[in-house]
Each structure stands twice: as structure tokens, then as C-alpha cells.
Amino acid sequence: MFKFLKKLSTFLIVLIGILLVGGITAAGYFAFENREPINNYYKEGYNKVKQYNEEIKKVSKSLSSNELVKTLGDVESSIKEGKELTKLLGDSALESSFNQLEDSLSKVNNFSKGSTFTEVKNTIEKINQYVDEILKRFPNPNENDQFKEYVTNISQIVFYVGVSIIGTFVVSGALLFIFTKRVYGVRVSRFNPQRLLKKHLVLLLQKNQDVYDEVFES
């Protein structure tokens, strides 16, 4: 049972190693063959993030220039003029509507001048700065092909490393098979075994003549 578990664990380790190295090699090959689409996806994502950040900058600029307060002031003036007209017309219902609108506008105006509005502006500016820093850390695909070169170089390195590992295993296995042979569970050289190894093998195998002949005479 112990021998079976030992062989099973060895087999699983070898299998996992083969799958891992094979997966790394395949990933490198796939990335190299598809470096153009990968670069296009990166470029598209980069430009979208940049576009969104520009839109946020426009909002931040509008808030910083206090366009909202200016617009609210214009609306407030129009409401006052409307109230004066309703007084001349004597329409109390319309005047009441203007009063409600003026009250709502005053609340918005107070918000735009308050600390909450300032916090909103500061938060938007922080978002702009953060996104700008992120974009600076990544290659700009609109200016150069640096990202494409990264993908090409890294994929080639990964592929060749995987191929080298696989090749090492194959060559080692071939050399082991060519220069050695397994006899009764013991791997010995196919060419000119040393006398000391011969002596110890005979003692170890309890001077079994059949085994001796198999190892040294065949």
C-alpha cells in the first residue's frame, strides 16, 4: 500500500509539473501570437479611462468656476421678475407657485455655497489627480508601442523558458534511457559497471547468480 501511494504521489507530482510547464509555454505562445489584439484591447481601455477622466475634469472645471452659482443667480432673478408680473396680474395661485420655486432654489443655492458643495468639488479633483497618476504609470498606446513591446518580450521569455524546461526533461530522460538500464528495480550503467558497484550489488542481492548474470553478463 505504501509503495502504491508513493508511486501515485510521484505520478501526480510529475503530472502537475508537466501541466504547469505546458500551461506556461502555451500561455507564452498564445500571448505572442495575439499580441496585436491584446495591444488593441489595452489601447481601447486606456482611451476610455482617459475619456472618462476628461469628462470629470470638465465637471470639476465648471464647479470650480462657480458656474452653478451664476446659473442659480440668473434663475433667481427670473423668478423675482415672474413674481412681480403675477402681482400685477393678481394671480395668487401663480404667485404661490413662484414662492415655492424660490424657496426650493434658495435651498439649492445654500447647498452650492456650503461646505458639502466644497467637499464634492474637492473629491472630484482628487479623483482627477488619482486617475492622472494611474495613466502616467502605464504606457500611452497613442504615443508609442511600448506596451506591445512588453507583451512581445515577456511572451517570448515565458515561451522559451517553458520550452527549455520541457527540452531539459526530454533530453535528460533520453540520456538516462540510453546510458542506464533498470534491473530488478536498480538502475545501473549500460557500459562498464565499476568493480565496487559489482561487488556491492552481488552482496546486496544475496549472491543471486541469476541477478548477477542479468546485471553484468547481459
UniProtKB/Swiss-Prot annotation:
Any one cellular-component term (Gene Ontology): plasma membrane
Ranges annotated as spanning the membrane: 11-31, 159-179
Keyword Transmembrane: yes
Subcellular location: Cell membrane
Lineage: superkingdom: Bacteria
The keyword Transmembrane is assigned to this record: yes
Keywords annotated in UniProt: Cell membrane, Membrane, Transmembrane, Transmembrane helix
Membrane topology category: Multi-pass membrane protein
InterPro entries: MG279/MG280
Protein name: Uncharacterized protein MG279 homolog
